[in-house]
From Swiss-Prot:
Residues 6-240 form the ABC transporter domain. ATP binds at residues 40-47. Forms a stable energy-coupling factor (ECF) transporter complex composed of 2 membrane-embedded substrate-binding proteins (S component), 2 ATP-binding proteins (A component) and 2 transmembrane proteins (T component). Keywords: ATP-binding, Cell membrane, Membrane, Nucleotide-binding, Translocase, Transport. It is a peripheral membrane protein. Gene3D superfamilies: P-loop containing nucleotide triphosphate hydrolases. This is Energy-coupling factor transporter ATP-binding protein EcfA1. Its EC number is 7.-.-.-. ATP-binding (A) component of a common energy-coupling factor (ECF) ABC-transporter complex. Unlike classic ABC transporters this ECF transporter provides the energy necessary to transport a number of different substrates. SUPFAM superfamilies: P-loop containing nucleoside triphosphate hydrolases. CDD domains: ABC_cobalt_CbiO_domain1. The gene is ecfA1. GO terms for cellular component: ATP-binding cassette (ABC) transporter complex.
Length: 279
C-alpha cells in the first residue's frame, strides 16, 4: 500500500508556559490530491497543526512527513517548498505594488529565472480568474479577490500541499464562495493536497474527509456525511452543523422522513420531490 503524502504520527506539542498540550497524540494522514478539513472550536489544536505542517513549529514528540521528507531543522526548507499557506487576513500577505508583483514576490525569493517567473505568474492568475487585475493595486480589491490573489501567489510556487488557515473567515458569503470555488477547481486541475483549517461548517462540505478536533485531540473522523450524521455529538463539543443539516432536522421534526443525510440543496430537493410524489 502506498504511503500517504502527508503524515503526522503521534504528534505532541505544548506552547511555552502552557499547562496542557495544544496537540496531544495526534495522527493524521492525507493522500495526494485529497481535501482534508480540520474543524474545531478555538483552542482545539487545529491551527497549531497548521503551523506544525509548515515547520513554523516543531513537535515535542512524534513524526511529521511531507512527501519524502521528515520535518527537521535539516529538511525545513524542503518541507516549505512543498507546502504553501493561505492565512486568515489577505491584507497581511501583500507586499507588491500590483497584483502581478505580489504573485511574483515568492518566486523572486526562490531565485526563479525571470522568463519562468513571468509564465508562472500569468498561469497562476489565470487559474484563479484574476489575470485581468494583474496591474491593479491589491488594496483596491474585494476580500474574495484578495484571497484569490494570495492563492495565486502560493500556486505560482507549485506546492504539493496547500494549507488554508481560516482563509475565508474574514470574507462575506460572496467572497467565501469565490475562494472555495477557486480551491475546488485548482485541486482538480493540479492534483494538490488541500488541508483546510476552519470553523466554518459549510466550508467543511467541500472536503473529502473531515477531522474534528477537541482539546488538542482527534474527536472524530470521517466523510462530511458521516460526521454530520452525528449532529448531537458535534453540538456537545461546542460545534454546530451546516444550514443544510439543520434544515433536514427541522423537516424530520415536521414529519418529513428523508432517506439519508444529504449535503446539498439539490439532493434535498430531490428527496422532497420523491416524498411528495409518493403521497
Amino acid at each position: 500500500m502506498a504511503e500517504s503524502f502527508v503524515r503526522l504520527e503521534h504528534v505532541f506539542y505544548k506552547y511555552e508556559d502552557a499547562e496542557k498540550y495544544a496537540v496531544k497524540d495526534v495522527s493524521i494522514s492525507a493522500e495526494k490530491g485529497e481535501w482534508v478539513a480540520l474543524v474545531g472550536h478555538n483552542g482545539s489544536g487545529k491551527s497549531t497543526i497548521a503551523k506544525l505542517l509548515n515547520g513554523l513549529l516543531f513537535p515535542e514528540e512524534g513524526l511529521i512527513k511531507i512527501g519524502h521528507f521528515v520535518l527537521s531543522e535539516k529538511n525545513i526548507w524542503e518541507i516549505r517548498r512543498q507546502v504553501g499557506m493561505v492565512f486568515q487576513n489577505p491584507d497581511n500577505q501583500f507586499v507588491g505594488a500590483t497584483v502581478q508583483d505580489d504573485v511574483a514576490f515568492g518566486l523572486e525569493n526562490h531565485g526563479v529565472p525571470h522568463d519562468t517567473m513571468v509564465k508562472r505568474v500569468e498561469s497562476a492568475l489565470n487559474e484563479v480568474g484574476m489575470q485581468s487585475y494583474a496591474l491593479h493595486e491589491p488594496a483596491r480589491l474585494s476580500g474574495g479577490q484578495k484571497q484569490r490573489v494570495a492563492i495565486a501567489g502560493v500556486l505560482a510556487l507549485q506546492p504539493d500541499v496547500i494549507i488554508l488557515d481560516e482563509a475565508t473567515s474574514m470574507l462575506d458569503p460572496r467572497g467565501r464562495a469565490e475562494v472555495m470555488e477557486t480551491i475546488r477547481i485548482m485541486r482538480e486541475q493540479e492534483d494538490i493536497t488541500v488541508i483546510s483549517i476552519t470553523h466554518d461548517l459549510d466550508e467543511v462540505l467541500f472536503a473529502d474527509r473531515v477531522i474534528v478536533m477537541n482539546n488538542g485531540e482527534i474527536h472524530s473522523e470521517g466523510t462530511p456525511q458521516e460526521i454530520f450524521q452525528q449532529a448531537d455529538a458535534m453540538r456537545e463539543i461546542g460545534l454546530g452543523v451546516p444550514f443544510i443539516i439543520e434544515l433536514q432536522e427541522k423537516l424530520v421534526a415536521g414529519g418529513f422522513e428523508t432517506e439519508s443525510t444529504v449535503l446539498s440543496e439539490g439532493a434535498l430537493l430531490d428527496q422532497l420531490w420523491k416524498l411528495n410524489s409518493n403521497n
